[in-house]
Each structure stands twice: as structure tokens, then as C-alpha cells.
From Swiss-Prot:
<keyword id="KW-0694">RNA-binding</keyword>
<dbReference type="InterPro" id="IPR001063">
    <property type="entry name" value="Ribosomal_uL22"/>
</dbReference>
<keyword id="KW-0699">rRNA-binding</keyword>
<dbReference type="GO" id="GO:0022625">
    <property type="term" value="C:cytosolic large ribosomal subunit"/>
</dbReference>
<dbReference type="GO" id="GO:0006412">
    <property type="term" value="P:translation"/>
</dbReference>
<protein>
    <recommendedName>
        <fullName>Large ribosomal subunit protein uL22</fullName>
    </recommendedName>
</protein>
<comment type="similarity">
    <text>Belongs to the universal ribosomal protein uL22 family.</text>
</comment>
<dbReference type="Pfam" id="PF00237">
    <property type="entry name" value="Ribosomal_L22"/>
</dbReference>
<dbReference type="GO" id="GO:0003735">
    <property type="term" value="F:structural constituent of ribosome"/>
</dbReference>
<keyword id="KW-0687">Ribonucleoprotein</keyword>
<dbReference type="InterPro" id="IPR005727">
    <property type="entry name" value="Ribosomal_uL22_bac/chlpt-type"/>
</dbReference>
<comment type="subunit">
    <text>Part of the 50S ribosomal subunit.</text>
</comment>
<dbReference type="GO" id="GO:0019843">
    <property type="term" value="F:rRNA binding"/>
</dbReference>
<keyword id="KW-0689">Ribosomal protein</keyword>
<comment type="function">
    <text>This protein binds specifically to 23S rRNA; its binding is stimulated by other ribosomal proteins, e.g. L4, L17, and L20. It is important during the early stages of 50S assembly. It makes multiple contacts with different domains of the 23S rRNA in the assembled 50S subunit and ribosome.</text>
</comment>
<comment type="function">
    <text>The globular domain of the protein is located near the polypeptide exit tunnel on the outside of the subunit, while an extended beta-hairpin is found that lines the wall of the exit tunnel in the center of the 70S ribosome.</text>
</comment>
<dbReference type="InterPro" id="IPR047867">
    <property type="entry name" value="Ribosomal_uL22_bac/org-type"/>
</dbReference>
Length: 115
């Protein structure tokens, strides 16, 4: 398998800033190690990124016939999705805006370079 295999999750209800904390931890890791890191991380983003990583691994196995032991997280990036704008009622007839941010998560797995 010379190419990378991708998996994407769009419109995930987590802010990109919080999700990037998790993504930065597993970038470049072998997939087995990355899955362990995500399994034991207490962050909400870890569970979401783990599902996308598992999907990328399954895509590599099914579509490319890749060996799981040879895969690593070659790329992972979190882009900002659309923001849901909500209001929060305050005193004296005022209102504050609440921004509910979304993320587009992209994970690419590729084979480790031998040598």
C-alpha cells in the first residue's frame, strides 16, 4: 500500500481547539499505540477521534488490503466547522450569545517506512 487511507467525520459537536489537543498527541504514532493512548485518555475528543481512527484502519484493511501492524497515523487534522449560535437570557432583558462550535476531523493512515 503506497497511498494513505482516509476517514473523515464532519460536523462533530466539539470545539476544534479541544479536539486538536488529542490529535497532537497521536500524530505520527503507530496505530496500535495511538488506539491505546485514546482509550485511556479522559478527554471527550479522545473517544471521537478514536472512532475516526478505527474507521481509517478498517478502510485501509478493506480497501487497500493493508497489514494493521504496519500502519501509522500519517496525518490527522481538525478543521473548524460551522458554528451554531444560541442565546442565553440575562438580567434586565438582555441576552448573551453562546457559540456551539463544530469540527471536521480527518485521519489518514499509511504504512511505516522501512529502513
Amino acid at each position: 500500500m503506497a497511498t494513505e487511507t482516509f476517514a473523515r467525520l464532519r460536523f462533530a459537536r466539539i470545539s476544534p481547539q479541544k479536539c486538536r489537543l488529542v490529535a497532537d498527541q497521536i500524530r505520527g504514532m503507530p496505530v496500535e499505540r495511538a488506539l491505546q493512548e485514546l482509550t485511556f485518555s479522559p478527554k471527550k475528543g479522545a473517544a471521537i477521534v478514536k472512532k475516526v481512527l478505527e474507521s481509517a484502519i478498517a478502510n485501509a484493511e478493506h480497501n487497500e488490503g493493508a497489514d494493521v501492524d504496519e500502519l501509522k497515523v500519517s496525518q490527522i487534522y481538525i478543521d473548524q466547522g460551522p458554528t451554531l449560535k444560541r442565546i442565553h437570557a440575562r438580567a434586565k432583558g438582555r441576552a448573551n450569545r453562546i457559540l456551539k462550535r463544530t469540527s471536521h476531523i480527518t485521519v489518514a493512515v499509511g504504512e511505516k517506512v522501512k529502513g
